[in-house]
Amino acid sequence: MPQVDPELFDRSQFQAELALKASPIAAYKKAIRQARQVLDERFRAGRDIRRLIEDRAWFVDQILRSAWSRFDWDKGADIALVAVGGYGRGELHPYSDIDLLILLDENDQEIFREPIEGFLTLLWDIGLEVGQAVRSVAECADEARADLTVITNLMESRTIAGPERLRQAMLQVTSTQQMWPSKEFFLAKRNEQRARHAKYNNTEYNLEPNVKGSPGGLRDIQTILWIARREFGTLNLQAMVDQGFITEGEHSLLTAAQEFLWKVRYGLHMLAGRAEDRLLFDHQRSLAALLGYEDSDAKLAIERFMQKYYRVVMSIAELSDLVGQHFAEVILWEGESGPIVPLNSRFQVRDGYLEVSNPAIFKRTPFAILETFVLLAQHPDIQGVRSDTIRLLRDHRYLIDDTFRQDLRNTSLFIELFKCKEGIHRNLRRMNRYGILGRYLPEFGHIVGQMQHDLFHIYTVDAHTLNVIKYLRKLTKPGVAEKYPLASKLVEKLPKPELIYIAGLYHDIAKGRGGDHSELGAVDAEQFCRRHKLPAWDTRLVVWLVENHLVMSTTAQRKDLSDPQVINDFAQRVGDETHLDYLYVLTVADINATNPTLWNSWRASLLRQLYTETKRALKRGLENPLGREEQIRQTQRAALDDLVRHGTDPDDAEQLWAQLGDDYFLRHTATDVAWHTDAIIEHPANGGPLVLIKETTQREFEGGTQIFIYAPDQHDFFAVTVAAMDQLNLNIHDARILTSSSQFTLDTYIVLEADGSPIGNNPERIEEIRSGLIAALRNPDDYLTIIQRRVPRQLKHFAFPPQVTIHNDTQRPQTILEIIAPDRPGLLARVGQLFLDFDLSVQNAKIATLGERVEDVFFVTDADNQPLSDPQLCLRLQQAIIKELQQENEQQPSPSSIVI
């Protein structure tokens, strides 16, 4: 810390201003304000961050000493002002808490009550954010013995004012001889760290990470230092080098990482104007600019900054693991080593952890680097890797070069890992953590820490990729059949499971390069397969999976699965059941690994329907596609059998069906047709709208909640319905809109609750929805008002210009209107109102919400039930939708198109 820094704090000028004023508050506030400005300017100018946070602590020292001196403490009184915690370390960020301990020799607070209260009041009045405790030395011992946080804070302390002997006495009564011996302290800190990591989903890669608390954050570095200080009296990272706990290279890496995170935290405090350790979307772009990042052709500044952040915290997490393992060996197991169990001439197991039998193993036999992870997978009872071996792995990464990558022993070992029954994900993740995976597969190294600046992908590309592997493994485990019934069944019958893991590893490998990542990734996948000597059929399958990994999800979510042509086209692309099985399993894993909230019951049912229909088409033969008439006959025959079995007169059913039209039977299953038919026949002719809600009691995880509405057609039907559903807090995931020849509407909506769950068998909720929709259709004017809801904070930071594309359907007499826009509350209700304004009827709709964006497709006709033919009308419609969905502060809309 500086001894004198007149620019930051001019003591003589400050004293002069104190003397001039009746109240000291203004002088203190002025000094604090000026110091903040000076330090912020130094930060912007690129001043060394370590010096900055030490300078801030030094400045606060001066203010506190001055404030302390204004009160009447008897000279030599048994009271001291002590800095603890981060401030005790001499580190202060702009709005960090200033943690103080007012330390007494005896429990005689009454003697000092008045000056203590006056001192603390002054600190609050001048605007210092202070956390304070008033304790005697004995009380410190009692509190520290009971509370891990207290003992940790007291370990990092400095005397600001008063006798130093009190702090020394406090340190004596809280030493390892008195409480928290090193083993107990280590275990408590390790459990504390694990609980903290769990709070942040055990990943360094959260979209809005906490710079301090997330895995790989500043708290992990502090945890290392706390344990070292408690056990060995080590005061800082350099001392850990001197004592042999870390190497010079690791010290340099940790120091650079710590200083980077300090810069991030300092900048966050500046931008937020308060204590803020969360790297929120609100600040990421501004912080990237503040730290000097600029856009390039390949990446935005924010993406470059966040990739740097993720790589830094990953390196901290890696070293935290290494040092933590070393501490465990030294603190927990010293003198308790069990027998050594040899695995082969290169590796052995000691105390449940893998280690090399000789420090020169990797140098002599480089293939042992990959063998490490294969052995861990083959012996799942091994708990991990000993710290010395982790360090040796890190130190010998340089051996992984092109020669290493082409060596048959290494390529064989890497493929062997994918054939293991256990531990594939765990050990690929270890390889990534230790920096091995990105060295062996340079194309993987490029995606490490690469963010995707949206809410759809909540992980970096490498984390998502490894999550895909995790979900692929999860599908093989007992207990997942309820949530993934089809995928868990299919994964068991894949002829070569290792191929789907390789496809999962490569499916997003080309993200961030520009161009179609599926096509570019397929090229990389083919090179991988050839280098690893995979057979030709295996290679073709892996390459096909990478190139087509998005096709099944986009088909299921954006196309009409009731259209036989859609199924036939998809079946043609898939070709056979083996490819279909592999693609379905990969798609399920990919969706779950992208964002756990994406896997809802509706997406599950769409994929299952596409799989089932495609499998049926493949069994029938691609040269014999199912025609419309045949599909309609099959559906009617099955539905009629069901109805007759339950007592419905077949003549009544066929009389109703004659009014419904072919599309109705193409878009609904036989079960749904029977359900609708029975209810319509029983419904009184003048009974008003019929609203049916299908309970989803049997499959908690499958199928969205289906709402069927049968009522006399009216022009505002769609607009009223979607507005009412919005007011009922329902998310619409699919809409099938039909009108019978008798001018009755038969509309089916697939909905989920706002949190993505099906409505299930909640009778009260079902009745609330049913009665709400009936009321809306009876009194439409009361429901067309759109509720104005606040746009969620996260969505505001992912605004992009809406895109509206209008073109006529080549297969059917209708116009296809596609909208890609930022998600916002009530969006579908707003679109429905515009359709009403333009006198449009909605024939069908596919609704998809992907993170912060919606990708909706509407099939519409004009008032005469014809496709739109007036280009000027289409242009006005397009402009109206864009204007309605345009958010304030957006750029100009992206180019949209009209093809009539």
Curated annotation (Swiss-Prot):
Region (Uridylyl-removing): 343-705
Xref: InterPro entries: ACT-like_dom_sf, ACT_dom, HD/PDEase_dom, HD_domain, NT_sf, PII_UdlTrfase/GS_AdlTrfase, Polymerase_NTP_transf_dom, UTase/UR
Record domain HD: where: 461-583
Domain spans labelled ACT: 706-789, 816-896
E.C. numbers: 2.7.7.59, 3.1.4.-
Pfam family, any one: HD
The entry's keywords: Hydrolase, Magnesium, Multifunctional enzyme, Nitrogen fixation, Nucleotidyltransferase, Repeat, Transferase
Activity regulation (UniProt): Uridylyltransferase (UTase) activity is inhibited by glutamine, while glutamine activates uridylyl-removing (UR) activity.
Cofactor entry: Mg(2+)
Intrachain disulfide bonds: none
Region described as Uridylyltransferase: 1-342
A GO molecular-function descriptor: phosphoric diester hydrolase activity
GO biological process: nitrogen fixation; regulation of nitrogen utilization
Catalytic reaction(s) noted: [protein-PII]-L-tyrosine + UTP = [protein-PII]-uridylyl-L-tyrosine + diphosphate; [protein-PII]-uridylyl-L-tyrosine + H2O = [protein-PII]-L-tyrosine + UMP + H(+)
Function as written in the Swiss-Prot or TrEMBL entry: Modifies, by uridylylation and deuridylylation, the PII regulatory proteins (GlnB and homologs), in response to the nitrogen status of the cell that GlnD senses through the glutamine level. Under low glutamine levels, catalyzes the conversion of the PII proteins and UTP to PII-UMP and PPi, while under higher glutamine levels, GlnD hydrolyzes PII-UMP to PII and UMP (deuridylylation). Thus, controls uridylylation state and activity of the PII proteins, and plays an important role in the regulation of nitrogen fixation and metabolism.
UniProt remark on domains: Has four distinct domains: an N-terminal nucleotidyltransferase (NT) domain responsible for UTase activity, a central HD domain that encodes UR activity, and two C-terminal ACT domains that seem to have a role in glutamine sensing.
Family: Belongs to the GlnD family.
Identification of the protein by name: Bifunctional uridylyltransferase/uridylyl-removing enzyme
Organism, scientific name: Stutzerimonas stutzeri (strain A1501) (Pseudomonas stutzeri)
Underlying gene: glnD
